[in-house]
């Protein structure tokens, strides 16, 4: 099994650290990590990967500093290229960022099952970009919706 993990923000790195350590215990599961660059700062990003023993990303997309539409669109283009090349069995997304939404939409369009960590959480404030991302991501997720407490 091949899992394409999409990350872009520091809280996602923290959660992914625990999940990636579990995935690494299984020889028949290969995880490919994609860092979108959404909240990229080399010092902050690198320290999270080192201290959480998270494998270095296989792909760094370098998408940041844009408005929501441009950022999500560029992420979708780049994630789609990676997904078409790697042919994952599952795309795993975390939380409620633009990276989350971009990965979920790509999985949906390419008919790749999506695992969404933190699915179903709501603030009920539709004015928040994160709430829009939560609702849209949950709508396209067909396979797995997980909450990690």
Task: Tell what function each PLM region has.
Residues 2, 6, 34, 89-90, 93-94, 117:
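Structural motif
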Residues 58, 89, 142:
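Conserved acidic residues
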Residues 29-71, 75:
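Conserved nucleotide-sugar phosphate-binding/catalytic loop shared by glycosyltransferases and other
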Residues 92-110:
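An aromatic- and histidine-rich active-site surface loop
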Residues 83-89:
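Proline-aspartate-enriched helix->loop->beta-strand connector
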Residues 1-38:
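N-terminal subdomain of nucleotide-sugar transferases
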Residues 112-149:
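Active-site-proximal region of nucleotide-activated glycan assembly enzymes
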